[in-house]
Amino acid sequence: MPIGVPRVPYRLPGEPYSQWISLDDRLYQERILFIGEPIDDNLANTIVGVMLYLNSQDPQKDIVMYINSPGGSVTAGMAIYDTMNHVKPDIVTVCVGQAASMGAFLLAAGTKGKRFALPHSRIMLHQPSLGMIQGQASDIEIRARETLRVKRRMNELLAQMTGQPLEKIERDVERDFYLSATEAQAYGIVDRVIQERSEAMAG
């Protein structure tokens, strides 16, 4: 039986009584974002909108993004990535569970020095896919060229974010490339493996 949207009690400053609000809204008030599902346009629009709002509220205070995602849409993920770089606050990224494909890309895209993984996290890199290619031969050729362009650009960005040579990135992502939390730290996807939330908050 579905339990619906989790709700938690929250009391506004100066109010005598608490009200029930969604868990997501409560986390947003603490400047915490949680990507806990496949990344699609709807999720990206929500995450982008919240980041823009939090930026307008306090451009100096960190935004914390927890990631437990199998990946998803390249275009949706890049919308989140570009917004992470567009807003002024540092973006703290924390992998809990798994960060695969675009989830791993966003994990690595956090502010340098503020990218974390919990001890039993699993990270997976692989080459991007723009979905099934169908249509006329000319359409297939156009889509194939675009796939190669996106792949090249994402590999270049991963090389910048991790410090790995581009040639190594290109080799590693040809097939699913799994890393433990400590291996992800050595690779440059995260900066530290942490035990407690306070470690991430401390930066």
Swiss-Prot record:
Its main location: cytoplasm. Its EC number is 3.4.21.92. The keyword Hydrolase applies. Cleaves peptides in various proteins in a process that requires ATP hydrolysis. Has a chymotrypsin-like activity. Plays a major role in the degradation of misfolded proteins. InterPro entries: ClpP, ClpP/crotonase-like_dom_sf, ClpP/TepA, ClpP_His_AS, ClpP_Ser_AS. One of its GO terms (molecular function) is ATPase binding. GO terms for cellular component: cytoplasm; endopeptidase Clp complex. It is an enzyme of class 3 (hydrolase). Belongs to the peptidase S14 family. Keywords: Cytoplasm, Hydrolase, Protease, Serine protease. It comes from the Bacteria. The active site is at S101, H126. Fourteen ClpP subunits assemble into 2 heptameric rings which stack back to back to give a disk-like structure with a central cavity, resembling the structure of eukaryotic proteasomes. Pfam families: CLP_protease (PF00574). It is found in: Cytoplasm. It catalyses: Hydrolysis of proteins to small peptides in the presence of ATP and magnesium. alpha-casein is the usual test substrate. In the absence of ATP, only oligopeptides shorter than five residues are hydrolyzed (such as succinyl-Leu-Tyr-|-NHMec, and Leu-Tyr-Leu-|-Tyr-Trp, in which cleavage of the -Tyr-|-Leu- and -Tyr-|-Trp bonds also occurs). It comes from Synechococcus sp. (strain JA-3-3Ab) (Cyanobacteria bacterium Yellowstone A-Prime). One of its GO terms (biological process) is protein quality control for misfolded or incompletely synthesized proteins. This is ATP-dependent Clp protease proteolytic subunit 1.
